[in-house]
Amino acid sequence: KTDNLGIETNITYNDWGLVLTQTDHLNNTLTNTYDNWGKLLTSKTNLGGTTTYTYEKLSNGDAKVTEYSPDNDQKITYTNKLGQNYKSSVKGFAENSYVSQEVQYDVLGRKIKESEPYFEGTSASKWNVTEYDDYSRPIKITQYTGKITTSSYSGRTVTATETNANNRFKTQVFDAIGNVTSTTDKGGTIEFKYNAAGENIESKYDKNVVATQYDNWGRKSLFNDPSNGIYQYEYNGYGQLIHTTSPKGHKYYNYDEYGRLYNQTEASNDGTSTNKNITITYNNKGLITNKNGTSNGKAYSSYVNYDANGRVISSGEN
């Protein structure tokens, strides 16, 4: 595949459409191997090393997958006959220690209990519990910390109330597509409105209203916060931000023919507190190498050097 900079990534596949090798323009390589069932056995990169996977069927019919990282750390996942992951273990910091976490399901396949991480050799003792109504909607979530979230449903509206161990509460109301329409705590209620695209257009607390406008492409064009002022946004034909106006001043963004930012200027309305002009340069691999310009009358420059694989080997600024 080739991107807009003309940079190529070469990929090969097996007969099943699985990636065998991938090499990018920096000669970073990925090589995968699979078993006869298409399960990943090894994944090797020239920089990170080899990750190995083993698969085991347990006597009760469950499956165990072990992932060995390049430094030989292990991650073990247990899956039941229904394909549900019910336990995972990762190597801990202490020698020969493992940290595990468990999940339990009901007969309908719904997650009803999830443990907090615990050290292998002990048993899970801290659980987060979920209860459902007859429509499989969560109605109560009890966390091990004592925080309880209850949800009630009325038509297309969902009301969720959180109460912690100190009896502090927060209630949120959601519309049919999951947008928060109001939030209430002891400080009061904040109400939210949205447009047809689901974008927030108004947030109201008491008599204070924060409004947001969007252009025909769904891009934020104006933000009006009575406590901070009005912010305006302009874009080019590719949807890239080119100009912002705030109560304090202006910012301009310029892009090259490949869509990369190459110049940024900032100027305050008073003409003195902020005055920046920064130019960015790239190497033939598309990586930033230099930033040069002025900031409030002082020269500014920074640089980044990379190795053949695109990793940063040195950087600095003046």
Positions of predicted regions on the chain:
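Acidic, low-complexity segments
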Residues: 1-318
